[in-house]
A protein has these predicted regions:
Chain A
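Short, compositionally biased
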Residues: 88-102, 106-112
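Structural motif
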Residues: 75-76, 90
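Hydrophobic beta-strand signal
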Residues: 79-80, 93
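Catalytic Cys-His active-site segments of thiol-dependent hydrolases/isopeptidases
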Residues: 113-119
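Short, positionally conserved secondary-structure boundary motifs
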Residues: 1-68, 99-100, 107, 122, ...
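Short coil-to-beta-strand transition motifs
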Residues: 74, 96-101, 131-132
Length: 146, 425
């Protein structure tokens, strides 16, 4: 039986760990061992670096060009963490009138706004909208064609 | 104390996390193969749509845009269920999944105020972290925790969490308001028989003499009485309970990371589960396969995955169940981990006698089903007479594709790179 492919439900363990470069740095010339030596032989795991809380982390694909000044481009993958309470300055995924949008949450004067990273779009005042934060963007993954 | 965390309208809630437009409107989830409703939002319940309603009866409402019907997306539900479990595990080492959307959480060693606070935190965090709304009931026994959970869900004054002690005015009031049929493990036939004795509410049953109940009814019901009195005596996989899901799992004799050994263990569990399914005249729609490493060995790498595989159609036939278990195991297995425990859960059960036949059903398929039925009956009889494992099925090889009808399945938002949700900038 083959139901459409099954993907690993949750990449909790390091799926593909990379070898850590050997630490060759010495602390000064005194010969005391460097703290970095404790990590010799460890491997690096991108999940561990990017996904702080797996249960609350979701990936999302970006559409549109309104966030390019914040380094978020059409087609990029966002790492969204729902366990963080949104504060001004965070890039958030918000539900606005039933749509899912990505903006920067800012306070202008004493009023909250959703701002774009593109001068062609003006800030949207939140007060007049049915708006809810879905999650906070922790990082963006941009893959280059190679 | 034992907490029960129950996800509200779980399948519909999973869909709503990624489709905010489904919020507040009637939504149903359909089984993919037999085309009937297997999950409903509150709005759909309010329209009088029952579980098991065939999709074609609702087609007109769908066309009018009054309701939304979605195909089931078990991959999504399995992933969201694992996330809920993970959030709970941040608070308690004792989390026992009871079904895909219900989990018992052990709350030991807290005073009453802390317990209440913890229940609120679980309620809030699961909702925030995963997007799934839940209710939390906490009490000294599983039966009372179930009852508290029901109160948390149905009675607005509790606001989603309800903590009750073994005794006291509040516990009494709740038990008095709970009909017998809503007590865990009390089926319809028992309700009728108990009514003849003048026992009509959970409180009446609690007041009954456990020994007399044992004589007149069963040990199982006696345990329910004691549980209602606040004395824990039901284990999670109590064999005598009628089930809405079948769990078979066990710790391995020793740690193992060998795929062959794991396959053998999962095969046994799946076959045992299928036998239990046939004994209680149920069919399953889906199977969950899980593995666990030893969480007490922090020196070893930890990995406790689970996955849900949908069965090609509701079935009690060991062969497709084994095939699905095998496929699930392959999907979650990773080398380099020492597993300590594994098992399967068969869920979304339907009554075998009330099974809706697929629209695609043909006389040939009906005849095939009869033959399958006889084969399974023969298998069970042999195993019963000659001892377990006399006749066993091997793990099937991957072959024939099954045709799934899942035209309305939503994307696998969390488990497929090509189907991630979109965020417009």
């Amino acid at each position: 039986m083959r139901v459409p492919e099954i993907y690993h439900p949750h990449p909790a363990p390091p799926y593909r760990a990379l070898p850590h470069p050997l630490a060759t740095i010495r602390a000064g010339i005194s010969g005391f061992p460097s703290p970095a030596e404790d990590y010799v032989g460890r491997t690096l795991d991108l999940n561990e670096r990017l996904v702080k809380r797996p249960s609350a982390t979701f990936f999302m694909t970006v559409t549109g060009d309104s966030m390019v000044d914040f380094g978020i481009q059409d087609g990029d993958t966002l790492v969204v963490d729902r366990s963080i309470d949104a504060r001004p300055g965070h890039i958030v995924v918000a539900l606005v009138d039933g749509e899912v949008i990505v903006k920067r949450y800012e306070m202008i004067g004493k009023r909250p706004y959703l701002c774009s990273g593109n001068s062609r779009y003006t800030p949207i005042p939140v007060a007049d909208l049915d708006c809810q934060v879905w999650g906070v963007v922790r990082s963006v993954i941009h893959e280059y064609p190679v | 104390m034992i907490g029960l965390v129950d996800c509200n309208n779980f399948y519909v809630s999973c869909e709503r996390v990624f489709q905010p437009r489904l919020e507040g409107v009637p939504v149903g989830v359909m089984s993919n193969n037999d085309g009937c409703v297997i999950a409903r939002s509150n709005e759909l319940k309010a329209l009088g749509v029952e579980m098991g309603t065939p999709a074609f009866e609702l087609q007109q409402w769908v066309n009018q845009g009054r309701i939304h019907l979605l195909s089931s997306n078990y991959e999504l539900y399995g992933d969201m269920s694992a996330r809920v479990r993970e959030v709970l595990e941040e608070f308690s080492a004792g989390v026992e999944p009871y079904s895909i959307d219900e989990m018992f959480v052990l709350f030991d060693g807290f005073d009453a105020a802390t317990t209440r606070q913890l229940a609120r935190t679980l309620y809030r965090n699961v909702r925030q972290f995963t997007g799934i709304p839940v209710c939390v009931g906490v009490a000294p026994t599983r039966t009372l925790a179930k009852l508290a959970n029901r109160a948390a869900k149905k009675l607005p004054e509790y606001g989603g969490t309800c903590v009750i002690p073994a005794d006291g005015a509040e516990t009494r009031r709740l038990l008095e308001r709970t009909a017998l049929g809503d007590v865990w493990g009390v089926g319809r036939r028992l309700v009728e028989r108990l009514a003849l004795q003048g026992i009509e509410t959970a409180w009446d049953l609690r007041q009954a003499d456990p020994k007399a109940i044992r004589r007149r009814f069963s040990v199982t019901l006696e345990r329910t009485v004691r549980e209602l009195q606040g004395m824990p005596c039901i284990e999670l996989n109590d064999a005598d309970r009628p089930r809405d899901r079948i769990m078979t799992s066990r710790s391995f004799g020793r740690h193992t990371g060998d795929l062959g050994e794991l396959q053998e263990a999962i095969r046994q569990h799946a076959q045992r589960g299928a036998e239990k399914l046939r004994r209680q005249d149920s069919l399953a729609r889906a199977i969950l396969v899980f593995l666990k490493t030893n969480c007490h060995r922090s020196d070893l790498p930890q990995y406790s995955p689970s996955v849900v595989v949908e069965l090609p159609e509701p079935t009690d036939d060991s062969r497709p169940i084994l095939a699905a278990a095998h496929q699930g195991l392959e999907a979650i297995y990773r080398r380099g981990y020492q597993f300590m425990k594994g098992g399967v859960m068969l869920f979304d059960l339907v009554d075998a006698n009330r099974q809706q036949l697929s629209l695609l059903d043909t006389p040939e398929r009906a005849a095939q089903r009869d033959r399958d039925h006889q084969l399974m009956a023969a298998l069970d009889e042999l195993n019963q007479k000659m001892g377990h494992g006399t006749v066993r099925l091997g793990m099937p090889s991957q072959n024939a594709a099954w045709h799934l009808r899942c035209a309305h399945r939503t994307p696998r938002w969390t488990t497929n790179w090509l189907e991630l949700p979109k965020g417009a900038t």
